[in-house]
């Protein structure tokens, strides 16, 4: 009995680090600003059959409607109530999405904005996505309800201007946003009620927006109030998966490690450093990636949520600066995402974006605020073209063959060791995942031609970067692995995608 009790305690302690994906699925995708009706369809027609584990959705709760500039993406990070009612859809549509995605084994993770309400400067009235009244100047949010008692004005009513002062970072206003007093049980209860409503609907977990701006103990107090996941889709006693947005590039008062007790943290150093390597800036080269992960100063793998770019830093917000790779840098981006999905470190998130007209002046995009593709503020449908790409300015990186097939690669090699590393002391590298998968990159300015140990059983394999295995045939390159596990690889430095990946399920 003692043994059983101990196991159940361990299970409880570890639950918030477990994404609760089904069938050994290992990656999630952020369908940034997508409507719930489009996500429900995408779960059924694409994400489930292609092996995606889940979707991070944009904040589902009512936000302020901003008209200057016109309907920016960041208005969704200015809540005014916890009603499920945004330009992505209403509560019925949200419930339908969660049910349909769960029914095909794809989980939903909610971007929870619980550090603050909207900016103090928003006018009083009903300029909100569901018509609820707000009076930020008087701290009135009657749809919750919150009043002046529920904010941190008595501790700090100014902006954060010193990130070396943890008190300021957590009690003052992030870019003018009214900071909630999360040490008050009333506020904790209101936040937990909102999150529990979503858990009961069937979500699997949460991204905690602006976690760095909340005290770890306050977050824990909220998490302690949360229900177990819905047993219709999750095993009894399952706790919500938690990943906290903590931007810690080093050199500030607050460290990501302070939040490990609550769940995983977003490892922003990952994309910033990998981008620098793939761009070959500062003398970095891919051969240095041999000890990628903790060896590069990243948080422990089982505490990391990793990504090449996110909705903030792909437009110069958040963290990472100019080294961040995005869909605008497609060739390098596919290499970076390929490396991420092949490497065992961290739990991976793929980005799915929309296009906007960039306008750089003095190195800054003046249009970094632009919201999703829309007609007069109504978000456009995600249409699917004949070639399986998306229309209406939705980028759908998760549908790019090279990325989609690497999501499948990660599923196939899950749990296998990082082995058979090879490099040329420059930017040609290769490694296997045990005997289940092998990947080789050429990021040099000259051709790669090498016979490498793949670790794979003998046979002919289909390269899943240049093509697909279809009905036992290969639409891309074929790789012949000998009885000694070796194969010859040739990759031109001018190839559209200068990398090759093969795995157990791509064997012909």
UniProtKB/Swiss-Prot annotation:
Principal location class: secreted
Does Signal show up as a keyword for this record? yes
According to UniProt, where does the site described as Transition state stabilizer lie?
A: 312
| GO molecular function terms listed in the Swiss-Prot or TrEMBL record | alpha-amylase activity; amylase activity; calcium ion binding; chloride ion binding
Q: Which cysteines are joined by disulfide bonds?
A: 43-101, 85-130, 156-172, 390-396, 462-474
| Catalyzed chemical reaction(s) | Endohydrolysis of (1->4)-alpha-D-glucosidic linkages in polysaccharides containing three or more (1->4)-alpha-linked D-glucose units
**Where do the annotations place chloride binding?**
207, 310, 349
**Changing residue 298 to M does what?**
In A1, B(A) and B(C)
Instruction: Give the Pfam families listed for this entry.
Output: Alpha-amylase, Alpha-amylase_C
Cofactor(s), by name: Ca(2+); chloride
Effect of altering residue 120 to S?
In A1, B(A) and B(C)
Using the record, list the residue span of the signal peptide; answer none if the entry has no such feature.
1-15
Q: Active site: which residues?
A: 209, 245
Q: Which terms does the UniProt entry file under GO BP?
A: carbohydrate catabolic process
- Where can this protein be found? Secreted, Extracellular space
Q: Which residues carry this modification: Pyrrolidone carboxylic acid?
A: 16
InterPro entries with a match to the protein in the record: A-amylase/branching_C, A-amylase_C, Alpha_amylase, Glyco_hydro_13_cat_dom, Glyco_hydro_b, Glycoside_hydrolase_SF
Q: Which family does it belong to?
A: Belongs to the glycosyl hydrolase 13 family.
Record note on quaternary structure: Monomer.
Q: What is this protein called?
A: Pancreatic alpha-amylase 2a5
Which organism was this protein described from?
Mus musculus (Mouse)
């Amino acid at each position: 009995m003692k043994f059983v009790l101990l196991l159940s305690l361990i299970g409880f302690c570890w639950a918030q680090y477990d994404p609760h994906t089904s069938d050994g699925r290992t990656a999630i995708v952020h369908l940034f600003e997508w409507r719930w009706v489009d996500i429900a369809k995408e779960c059924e027609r694409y994400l489930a059959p292609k092996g995606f584990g889940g979707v991070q959705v944009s904040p589902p709760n009512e936000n302020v409607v901003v008209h200057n500039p016109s309907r920016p993406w960041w208005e969704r990070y200015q809540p005014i109530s916890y009603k499920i009612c945004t330009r992505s859809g209403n509560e019925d549509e949200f419930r339908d999405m969660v049910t349909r995605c769960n029914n095909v084994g794809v989980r939903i993770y909610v971007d929870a904005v619980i550090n603050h309400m909207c900016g103090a400067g928003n006018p009083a009235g009903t300029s909100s996505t569901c018509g609820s009244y707000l009076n930020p100047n008087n701290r009135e949010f009657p749809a919750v309800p919150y009043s002046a008692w529920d904010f941190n004005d008595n501790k700090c009513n100014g902006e954060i201007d010193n990130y070396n002062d943890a008190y300021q970072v957590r009690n003052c206003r992030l870019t003018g946003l009214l900071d909630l007093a999360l040490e008050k049980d009333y506020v904790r209860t209101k936040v937990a009620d909102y999150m529990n409503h979503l858990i009961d609907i069937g979500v699997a977990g949460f991204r905690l927006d602006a976690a760095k701006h909340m005290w770890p103990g306050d977050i824990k107090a909220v998490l302690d109030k949360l229900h177990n996941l819905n047993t219709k889709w999750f095993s009894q006693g399952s706790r919500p998966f938690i990943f906290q947005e903590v931007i810690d590039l080093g050199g500030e008062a607050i460290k990501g490690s302070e939040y490990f007790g609550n769940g995983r943290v977003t490892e922003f150093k990952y994309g910033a450093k990998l981008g620098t390597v793939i761009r070959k800036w500062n003398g970095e080269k891919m051969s240095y990636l041999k000890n990628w992960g903790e060896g590069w100063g990243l948080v422990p793998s089982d505490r990391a949520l990793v990504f090449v770019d996110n909705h903030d830093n792909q437009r110069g917000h958040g963290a990472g600066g100019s080294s961040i790779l995005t869909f605008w840098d497609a060739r390098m981006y596919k290499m970076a995402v390929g490396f991420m999905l092949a490497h065992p470190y961290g739990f991976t998130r793929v980005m799915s974006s929309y296009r906007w007209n960039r306008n750089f002046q003095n190195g800054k995009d003046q249009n970094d605020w632009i919201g999703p593709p829309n007609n007069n503020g109504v978000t456009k449908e995600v249409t699917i073209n004949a070639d399986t790409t998306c229309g209406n300015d939705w980028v759908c990186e998760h549908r790019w063959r090279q990325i989609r097939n690497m999501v499948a690669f990660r599923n196939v090699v899950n749990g296998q060791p990082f082995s058979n590393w090879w490099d040329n002391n420059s930017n040609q590298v290769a490694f296997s995942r045990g005997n289940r998968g092998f990947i080789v990159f050429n990021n040099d300015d000259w051709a790669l031609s090498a016979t490498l140990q793949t670790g794979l059983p003998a046979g002919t394999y289909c390269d899943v970067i240049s093509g697909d295995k279809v009905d036992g045939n290969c639409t891309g390159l074929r790789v012949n692995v000998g009885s000694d596990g070796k194969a010859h690889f040739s990759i031109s430095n001018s190839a559209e995608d200068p990398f090759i990946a093969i795995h157990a399920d791509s064997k012909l």
